[in-house]
Regions:
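Short, conserved loop/helix-junction motifs that constitute active-site signature segments
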Residues: 78-84, 116, 140-142
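Rossmann-like NAD(P)-binding element
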Residues: 45-47, 53-86, 91-96
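General beta-strand structural signal in soluble alpha/beta enzymes
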Residues: 50, 120-124, 173-177
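Active-site-lining helix/loop region of Rossmann-like oxidoreductase modules
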Residues: 143-218
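NAD(P)+-binding Rossmann beta1-loop-alpha1 motif at the extreme N-terminus of oxidoreductases
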Residues: 1-39, 43
Length: 218
């Protein structure tokens, strides 16, 4: 599969490394230093390349958006239309001084879907730090793998992203639609799964409890 990565920093860069190692083709983009980005891509092997956000958007069967919250408008402007694309949204709504408040009581995932209305958005790869993801990918046996939660309104898109989560060495756990994404979004707080480490069995129980409205974080 071809994966365009917009934002090849800690989360996006690590995901690109894991995807390339699993046999996917990746294109890294959105850097102030194109030469350094090219070096980063070269370090991932023959399946990786670099370019502009528009290149990543056109290249990818899947596009990963992994930029700071304040950089999203610029990144999307450079990417151009994402209509029909599966977009993995790894962003968290951090702003200077804390978490960015959102209008209308929507989740951050819903807000980003409004910013790219034609995209098939799936929220994932955002609940655990980049260092933790890098060090814990690929645990064996499978039942000990670390969980990455996902939310989205497009079931087929979620299936694709769940497969990529598995390819990256994690276990996927579906929390529902974009309106259900709140518990997996920043900040870390009681009643959320953001910042918490789960195994598959515990994640299934947490997902069921969230749907039933009776979940409290460990």
């Amino acid at each position: 599969m071809k994966i365009g990565v917009i934002g090849a920093g800690r989360i996006g860069g690590n995901a690109a490394r894991l995807f390339a190692a699993a046999g996917h083709d990746v294109l890294l983009s959105f850097s102030r230093d194109p030469d350094r980005l090219a070096e980063q891509a070269a370090g991932l092997g023959a399946r990786a390349s670099s370019g502009r956000p528009r290149d990543a958007a056109q290249f990818g069967d899947v596009v990963m958006l992994s930029v700071p919250w304040s950089a999203i408008p610029d990144a999307l402007g450079q990417a151009g239309p994402l209509d029909g694309k599966i977009v993995i949204d790894t962003t968290n709504q951090f702003a200077p001084g804390g978490v960015q408040p959102l209008p209308g009581g929507v989740t951050a995932a819903q807000y980003n879907q409004q910013r790219m209305p034609g995209a098939r958005l799936v929220k994932s790869f955002n609940t655990l730090t980049s260092g933790f993801q890098a060090s814990q990918a690929g645990r064996t046996p499978p039942e000990t793998r670390v969980v990455l939660f996902l939310c989205g309104d497009d079931e087929k898109a979620k299936q694709v992203v769940a497969g990529l989560i598995e390819d990256a060495g994690f276990a996927p756990a579906d929390l529902g639609g974009l309106a259900d994404a709140g518990p997996m979004e920043a900040p870390r707080r009681p009643g959320s799964v953001y910042g918490e480490e789960y195994r598959p069995a515990d994640a299934r129980a947490a997902a069921e409890a969230l749907r039933a409205g009776r979940y409290s974080s460990p």
